[in-house]
Amino acid sequence: MPPRRYNPDTRRDELLERINLDIPGAVAQALREDLGGTVDANNDITAKLLPENSRSHATVITRENGVFCGKRWVEEVFIQLAGDDVTIIWHVDDGDVINANQSLFELEGPSRVLLTGERTALNFVQTLSGVASKVRHYVELLEGTNTQLLDTRKTLPGLRSALKYAVLCGGGANHRLGLSDAFLIKENHIIASGSVRQAVEKASWLHPDAPVEVEVENLEELDEALKAGADIIMLDNFETEQMREAVKRTNGKALLEVSGNVTDKTLREFAETGVDFISVGALTKHVQALDLSMRFR
């Protein structure tokens, strides 16, 4: 039976709780970058070209296909700039498939505020939708296998929870949210601890409920990790045949994760070896933003 202490799905609830705390701060930081260190829309000198009492209606559309993500970040941008004076009419929800030229949402409110918040709101949606779209592509490549796609901690600074939420919207699952929710024992940890067994035993003693993962670079290290009782074993830069042998040797005694050299060309091949997880750092560190635009009507 697979180890009982590891289930990526449980991280979903943890992440959603963290999102509630992180969104206001992330949005405030983004607005301060645009508004001279404040969240005061009056600092937008170009927007002052418009009459102070002018109100406008705007529509945000996508210029390419993808998966939408970022609804709550958009809402928070305009809440911080104008309280409840901006109305948002949503045509999509997080996780929805979107098509080129589709209207995503409409905005009605003070013209100055709509223009001031435009770039910050679109930055969040473009980035998060880009991640969700790439994840969905990878997830579709895994259809018919028993392998689950995971993200990593390789995220853009300040956007950890947001990017991991986008992974969920794309259909993937979360690896560690940070350094406090699971052990990932690598070469330097093993050297400092004395051995794989000593590192795993101490980890299990320190935090009995936390999953213990060990990264290995060859089949001999895999055997050591299995004997030590690791919950998950990460196969780092293994060749495909080595992965098959690792699955055979493990025989359900631990969960296996593949990392390294993963692209949309190799993903399916790796999954068909029978590993449990494939983690891809590029999902959240090489972000290609979705092309969106806002137009006044």
From Swiss-Prot:
Molecular-function GO terms, alphabetical: nicotinate-nucleotide diphosphorylase (carboxylating) activity
Keyword set, alphabetical order: Glycosyltransferase, Pyridine nucleotide biosynthesis, Transferase
Alphabetical list of SUPFAM superfamilies matching this protein: Nicotinate/Quinolinate PRTase C-terminal domain-like, Nicotinate/Quinolinate PRTase N-terminal domain-like
Pathway field: Cofactor biosynthesis; NAD(+) biosynthesis; nicotinate D-ribonucleotide from quinolinate: step 1/1
Catalytic activity field: nicotinate beta-D-ribonucleotide + CO2 + diphosphate = quinolinate + 5-phospho-alpha-D-ribose 1-diphosphate + 2 H(+)
Annotated InterPro entries: Aldolase_TIM, NadC, NadC/ModD, Nicotinate_pribotase-like_C, Quinolinate_PRibosylTase_N_sf, Quinolinate_PRibosylTrfase_C, Quinolinate_PRibosylTrfase_N
Gene Ontology cellular component list: cytoplasm; cytosol
Gene3D superfamilies reported for this sequence: Aldolase class I (3.20.20.70), Quinolinate phosphoribosyl transferase, N-terminal domain (3.90.1170.20)
Enzyme Commission number(s) of this protein: 2.4.2.19
Annotated residues for binding of substrate: 119, 152-154, 176, 186, 215, 236, 259-261, 280-282
One GO term of the biological process aspect: 'de novo' NAD biosynthetic process from L-aspartate
Enzyme class, broadest EC rank: transferase
Subunit structure: Homodimer Hexamer formed by 3 homodimers. Homodimer.
Family: Belongs to the NadC/ModD family.
Function in brief: Involved in the catabolism of quinolinic acid (QA).
Protein name: Nicotinate-nucleotide pyrophosphorylase [carboxylating]
